[in-house]
Curated annotation (Swiss-Prot):
Principal EC category: hydrolase
Catalytic activity annotation: [protein]-L-glutamate 5-O-methyl ester + H2O = L-glutamyl-[protein] + methanol + H(+); L-glutaminyl-[protein] + H2O = L-glutamyl-[protein] + NH4(+)
Function: Involved in chemotaxis. Part of a chemotaxis signal transduction system that modulates chemotaxis in response to various stimuli. Catalyzes the demethylation of specific methylglutamate residues introduced into the chemoreceptors (methyl-accepting chemotaxis proteins or MCP) by CheR. Also mediates the irreversible deamidation of specific glutamine residues to glutamic acid.
Keyword Nuclease included in the entry's annotation: no
PTM comment, free text: Phosphorylated by CheA. Phosphorylation of the N-terminal regulatory domain activates the methylesterase activity.
Keyword Protein transport appears in the UniProt entry: no
Keywords: Chemotaxis, Cytoplasm, Hydrolase, Phosphoprotein
Family, as annotated: Belongs to the CheB family.
Name of the encoding gene: cheB2
One biological process term in Gene Ontology: chemotaxis
Protein name: Protein-glutamate methylesterase/protein-glutamine glutaminase 2
Location relative to the cell: Cytoplasm
Organism from which the protein derives: Burkholderia lata (strain ATCC 17760 / DSM 23089 / LMG 22485 / NCIMB 9086 / R18194 / 383)
GO cellular component: cytoplasm
Length: 339
């Protein structure tokens, strides 16, 4: 994998070089010391992956991510001194299109820490699988579902998701009558913080989904672990390790398919910005079961991958700009219409 490094600290750059040198399949393509240089390098010498620091002179990592995704889109992994100390900026960068975040490796530390070489390499491998994979797994159907379940809005998002989710959720009223469950591609270390972050931007309560949680009208639940979130036929949320071989955990396809297979109440599917194809087949399964489904359009997507895949296979009842998705949900849920 050809990798670009964006970091103004020589010691951090050297640490990244040494970690990447542990793998013969990784090569440092270039090093930029600020966001402006990073944008220019991405245009002139497109990498497979950018390792993006957050705090830099001139143009910081959030602004650089936004500019790169606009001019020369590529996979971006935030690598910064302390993810936990920069959570707001991490979510901003992910909202602009970054795929994940990890602490800058410190070679003197043990191998089990979040700042270890292995932690960085694991994130790079995960992104590599996402870039290469074009498959999605389905959840087998369960027994007969329970009746009387409320209206459900199932949302999937990846790169660019935090910003898109913020815009969508803040446009919903406090008395929104449906339950909302979100699967966002994010490491479990950031899930609780992201739920709290989203909660600050919406009139609806946002919390992480626990094993055994039940979706309730007017409440937003966010997938919270690196296992796959699914809905049982009785309308209870759970987590599963299977399927094991998926490029991203949690999988949007797994969740959407569980909704299609077992949710008895009315359901809506929404697939937002993201890289790859996760969610496209699950959205199609939901539409095949009579659910109204929406894919975000290209113009408003930070990364037009997942919604593009959904559009290509006819999975979306409607392809809408981000600002029209919430009004469409409000209209359809208060005045139900058939696809």
């Amino acid at each position: 994998m050809n990798i670009g490094i964006v970091n103004d600290l020589p010691l951090a750059v050297e640490a990244l070089r040494r970690v990447l040198a542990l793998r013969t399949d990784h090569r440092v393509l270039w090093v930029a010391t600020d966001g402006d240089e990073a944008v220019d390098f991405c245009v002139a010498h497109p990498p497979d992956l950018v390792l993006m620091d957050l705090v830099m002179p001139k143009v910081d990592g959030v602004a650089a991510t936004r500019r790169i995704m606009a001019r020369a889109p590529c996979a971006i992994l935030v690598v910064t001194a302390s993810v936990s100390a920069n959570t707001s900026s991490v979510y901003e960068a992910m909202g602009a299109g970054a795929l994940d975040a990890v602490d800058t490796p410190t070679l003197a530390l043990g191998l089990s820490t979040d700042a270890s070489p292995q932690a960085l390499l694991a994130k790079i491998d995960q992104i590599g699988r996402l870039l290469e994979s074009r498959t999605a797994a389905l959840v087998p159907p369960g027994p007969a579902p329970e009746r009387g379940q409320p209206t459900l809005v199932a949302i999937g998002a990846s790169a660019g998701g935090p910003t898109a989710l913020t815009a969508l959720l803040r446009a919903l009223p406090a008395d929104f009558p449906a339950a909302i469950v979100i699967v966002q591609h994010v490491d479990q270390a950031f899930a609780l913080g992201m739920a709290e972050w989203l909660d600050g931007y919406t009139r609806l309560p946002v919390r992480v989904a626990r094993q055994g949680s039940v979706p309730q009208p007017g409440e937003v639940l966010l997938a919270a672990t690196n296992d796959h979130l699914y809905l049982s036929p009785r309308g209870v949320l759970g987590y599963t390790r299977h399927p094991v071989e998926t490029p991203y955990r949690p999988s949007i396809d797994v969740f959407f398919n569980s909704v299609a297979d077992g949710w008895q109440g009315e359901a809506f599917g929404v697939l937002l910005t993201g890289m790859g194809r996760d969610g496209a087949l699950g959205l199609k399964a939901m539409r095949a079961k009579g659910c109204y489904t929406i894919a975000q359009d290209e113009a408003t997507s930070a990364v037009y991958g997942m919604p593009k895949a959904a559009a290509a296979i006819g999975a979306a009842s409607a392809i809408l700009p981000l600002e029209r998705i919430a009004p469409q949900l409000i209209s359809r849920i208060t005045r139900p219409l058939r696809d």
